């Protein structure tokens, strides 16, 4: 949760993101500094996590910066942030140490022990009328939802002991050397440990350990061995009967195949004989038809010869008759000419006789 201005107005939260803010604290754990230092701290907090400057001890005389890698590790993933409700850092630390929660909604700042103030990273307190600073302090309380993830039962641990993935004491010493208080360093390391444990829980939901893999592999191999034994037993008992039945069926199939082949050969021979008989019969019919055609041709030729003979005879008869008629006409013609000439001469003689008479 960030503070955008000294007036204490709440800025919008980024979805799925949680920021861990470290406030400057003195060596003795008592409120100290001036109002200008408080305002400088507030402006640095409003700029983001990169501008955090924890105050170093007075003997050092310098200001150290938090490591960017450490700040990146302290920002949990959106999936972890959505899994648990948000809770302020002061409430979480007070519930861990056994302190009661302060009353909410008051304008004045509440006081606690120096150790708790140093662990929570409290701002310097003022007893005067500073409602803007008090409201900003109330707005700058840390939401540590990812630190309150309930520890689930893990299958990958043989005992309920806590498993660490890095040297926490060395990290605490490093943070103390860089200007953080002891309780602040312990809180940061505990937050890192819990974040790593939560991430490992998420990883182990989808994965298994080497031991579990070996156990599962041995179980699968034992099941495969049992299946092999069952297969051998079945091969000796049931597979022998199945093989005998298969052999019997093969013999029956072979016999049926032989019978079918014999029937096919018989049918082929019968069809061949039928084809040959039909072929010979067709050939005989063809020869008979050829003979009949030859006889018909000879008869037709004889009829044509007879017809030609009859025609020649009729032609000759017609010619003889025509010649006889011609001779008869010629003879009648001569007779007619003779008769006409005789009649004409007779008429002339009569006419000459009458003419002589008249004359």
UniProtKB/Swiss-Prot annotation:
Bilayer-spanning residue ranges: 69-85, 339-358
Membrane-side (Mitochondrial intermembrane) residue stretches: 1-68, 359
Cellular compartments annotated: Mitochondrion inner membrane
UniProt topology in membrane: Multi-pass membrane protein
InterPro entries: CCDC90-like (IPR024461)
GO biological process terms held by the UniProt record: calcium import into the mitochondrion; calcium ion import; mitochondrial calcium ion transmembrane transport; positive regulation of mitochondrial calcium ion concentration
Reported tissue expression: Ubiquitously expressed.
Keyword field: Calcium, Calcium transport, Coiled coil, Ion transport, Membrane, Mitochondrion, Mitochondrion inner membrane, Transmembrane, Transmembrane helix, Transport
Keyword match Membrane: yes
Family of this protein: Belongs to the CCDC90 family.
Subunit structure: Interacts (via coiled coil regions) with MCU; the interaction is direct. Interacts with SMDT1/EMRE; the interaction is direct. Interacts with PPIF.
Record-given protein name: Mitochondrial calcium uniporter regulator 1
Source organism of the structure: Homo sapiens (Human)
Taxonomic lineage from the root: Eukaryota, Metazoa, Chordata, Craniata, Vertebrata
Designated gene of the protein: MCUR1
């Amino acid at each position: 949760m960030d503070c955008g201005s000294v007036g204490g107005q709440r800025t919008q939260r980024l979805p799925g993101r949680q920021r861990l803010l470290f406030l400057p604290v003195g060596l003795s754990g008592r409120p100290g500094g001036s109002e200008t230092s408080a305002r400088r701290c507030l402006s640095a907090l409003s700029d983001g996590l990169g501008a955090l400057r924890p105050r170093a001890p007075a003997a050092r005389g310098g200001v150290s910066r938090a490591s960017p890698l450490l700040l990146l590790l302290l920002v949990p993933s959106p999936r972890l942030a959505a899994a648990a409700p948000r809770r302020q850092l002061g409430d979480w630390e007070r519930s861990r140490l056994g302190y009661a929660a302060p009353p909410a909604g008051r304008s004045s700042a509440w006081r606690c022990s120096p150790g708790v103030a140093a662990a929570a990273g409290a701002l310097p307190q003022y007893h005067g009328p500073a409602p803007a600073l008090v409201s900003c302090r109330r707005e700058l309380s840390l939401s540590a939802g990812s630190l309150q993830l309930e520890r689930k039962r893990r299958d990958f641990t043989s005992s309920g002991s806590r498993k660490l993935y890095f040297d926490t004491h060395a990290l605490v010493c490093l943070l103390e050397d860089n200007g953080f208080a002891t309780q602040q360093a312990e809180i940061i390391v505990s937050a890192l440990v819990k974040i790593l444990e939560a991430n490992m829980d998420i990883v182990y939901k989808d994965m298994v350990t080497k031991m579990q893999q070996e156990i599962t592999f041995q179980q699968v191999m034992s099941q495969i061995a049992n299946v092999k034994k069952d297969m051998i037993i079945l091969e000796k008992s049931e597979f022998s009967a199945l093989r005998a039945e298969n052999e019997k069926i093969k013999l029956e199939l072979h016999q049926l195949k032989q019978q079918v082949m014999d029937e096919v050969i018989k049918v082929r021979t019968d069809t061949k004989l039928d084809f040959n008989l039909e072929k010979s019969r067709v050939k005989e019919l063809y020869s008979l038809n050829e003979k009949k055609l030859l006889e018909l041709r000879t008869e037709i030729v004889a009829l044509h010869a007879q017809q030609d003979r009859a025609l020649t005879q009729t032609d000759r008869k017609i010619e003889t008759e025509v010649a006889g008629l011609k001779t008869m006409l010629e003879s009648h013609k001569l007779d007619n000419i003779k008769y006409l000439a005789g009649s004409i001469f007779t008429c002339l003689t009569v006419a000459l006789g009458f003419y002589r008479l008249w004359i």
